[in-house]
């Protein structure tokens, strides 16, 4: 019962954090000269998803691992911001991802040598850079943006080895299925598509289930 009550309370914190994420995203969009949307999923989605995820992580970790819960909640909030901003604007912001990468690099020192997290993040980023360049060369169109490359590097810093492999696999599979669905729906396999949300979902799944 204690864990349930704590999870409910932390879910409320997540709802508030999600609202702040949306508020900040609107401000950042305007700095990028982008017009934010105000559809229900855009306005309420971050709060709902953050509340759900914060509650799940709180129930799993409990009060015995409070510092770890706070840290993971911050990373989850970054992924939530990426999901909704990239879906809305097809953009992953340097103003969000670079500070998050710095925090993840420091946090990676917690349970591994200083170079391990950096090496994993760099490797993940380079893999996606290669996929981006190769895909663009073969298809004559941008397949993965540099935002996806930076997101992959952030995931590597957060998850470390070997969990980054699982997260990228989940993200790529989810993204491929969604891309085919969007292509069929729009009757064009060259439709604009955001891969970042699916990479972020893969990272969240691994962070919760295996890490």
Predicted regions and their residues:
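A membrane-topology feature that recognizes alpha-helical transmembrane segments
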Residues: 1-211
């Amino acid at each position: 019962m204690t864990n349930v009550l704590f999870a409910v309370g932390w879910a409320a914190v997540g709802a508030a954090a999600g609202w702040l994420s949306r508020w900040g995203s609107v401000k950042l969009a305007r700095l990028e000269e982008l017009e934010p949307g105000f559809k229900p999923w855009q306005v309420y989605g971050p709060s709902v998803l953050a509340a759900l995820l914060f509650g799940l992580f709180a129930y799993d970790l409990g009060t015995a691992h409070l510092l770890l819960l706070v840290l993971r909640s911050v990373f989850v909030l970054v992924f939530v911001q990426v999901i909704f901003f990239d879906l809305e604007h097809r953009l992953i912001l340097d103003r969000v991802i670079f500070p998050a990468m710095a925090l993840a690099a420091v946090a990676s020192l917690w349970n591994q040598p200083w170079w391990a997290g950096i090496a994993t993040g760099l490797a993940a980023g380079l893999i996606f850079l290669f996929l981006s360049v190769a895909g663009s060369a073969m298809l004559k169109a941008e397949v993965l943006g540099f935002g996806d490359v930076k997101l992959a590097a952030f995931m590597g810093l957060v998850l470390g080895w070997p969990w980054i492999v699982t997260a990228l696999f989940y993200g790529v599979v989810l993204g491929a299925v969604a891309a085919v669905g969007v292509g069929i729906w729009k009757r064009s396999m060259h439709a604009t598509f955001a891969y970042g949300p699916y990479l972020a979902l893969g990272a969240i799944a691994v962070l919760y289930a295996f890490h």
